[in-house]
């Protein structure tokens, strides 16, 4: 009897320790390193895609990558879902932070920028990031 209780307690400890190792993902979402991911085969501009992701789950956003391994995981998911090789990720307005300077070393004082914002998409055929108008349409991957 004592041995049964000891073994049962041991199994309970193992179960509880393993249950916290993966994210609690919704049905249809895939888990990696404590986060949940889902590719959506819907064409949206960047802002609409980000808004859609925030509505899926608390803490949801367009995917962000913290490592090449995470990017590889997401690309495999995307290839199973998309007809196209590009998808939005959560990086945007990267050019607004640049310190522009003229080639003659003069500071930029006069500005006539178009109101175009640039957002970043992931090209899964070569695992590279590219920027394009945030108004363009692309598939996307959400993460929470």
Swiss-Prot record:
Keywords: Blood coagulation cascade inhibiting toxin, Calcium, Disulfide bond, Hemostasis impairing toxin, Metal-binding, Secreted, Signal, Toxin. Residues 1-23 form the signal peptide. It holds the Pfam family Lectin_C. Expressed by the venom gland. Disulfide bonds join 25-36, 53-142, 119-134. It is found in: Secreted. GO terms for cellular component: extracellular region. GO terms for molecular function: metal ion binding; toxin activity. Its main location: secreted. PANTHER family: MANNOSE, PHOSPHOLIPASE, LECTIN RECEPTOR RELATED. This is Snaclec coagulation factor IX/factor X-binding protein subunit B1. It comes from Trimeresurus stejnegeri.
């Amino acid at each position: 009897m004592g041995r049964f209780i000891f073994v049962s307690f041991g199994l309970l400890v193992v179960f509880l320790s393993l249950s916290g190792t993966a994210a609690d993902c919704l049905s249809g979402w895939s888990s990696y390193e404590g986060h949940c991911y889902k590719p959506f085969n819907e064409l949206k501009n960047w802002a609409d895609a980000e808004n859609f992701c925030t509505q899926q789950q608390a803490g949801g956003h367009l995917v962000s990558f913290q490592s090449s391994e995470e990017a590889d995981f997401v690309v495999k998911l995307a290839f199973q879902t998309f007809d196209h090789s590009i998808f939005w990720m959560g990086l945007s307005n990267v050019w607004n932070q640049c310190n522009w300077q003229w080639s003659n070393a003069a500071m930029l004082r006069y500005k006539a920028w178009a109101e175009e914002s640039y957002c970043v998409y992931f090209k899964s055929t070569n695992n590279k990031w590219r920027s394009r108008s945030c108004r363009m349409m692309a598939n996307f991957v959400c993460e929470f």
